[in-house]
Amino acid sequence: MSLGDIRNLDYTILLCSKMQETKQFYLDVMGFPLAHDSDNWVSFQVGSALLTLRPRGPWAAWHDGPFSPGSAAVQLAFRVAPHLIDSCYATLQSKGVTILSPPRDIPSWHHRALFFRDPEDNVIELYAEV
């Protein structure tokens, strides 16, 4: 086996300082279905993958170390159908989400995309292939 044999990204874990607020964001704003909810982590089903949130700090397998406030740790990109980008934008605005970049065409990527942040300051991209 080599690392080149890896074929799937099954789950992504976001380390959270604002666990409850971030959980509510992915439930209420993003509308992701809850797959698992426990005392120290929560997972949402996003297509065939899981998006998991856990508190920052010591963990069973390792300790994530110090956090630099204001720095984005990750950018998540979620694909939607092309006709949904503008309605997603309107929904985000109606829920009070601050938009970093409104929907725009990015020809070199073959995308129409918009960008915003979650409560942990992670950059979220919604995009459609065009």
Regions found by a protein language model. Give the residues of each.
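Short glycine-/small-residue motifs
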Residues: V123-L126
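Short hydrophobic beta-strand elements that form part
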Residues: I13-L14
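Secondary-structure boundary/capping motif
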Residues: Q20-K23, A113
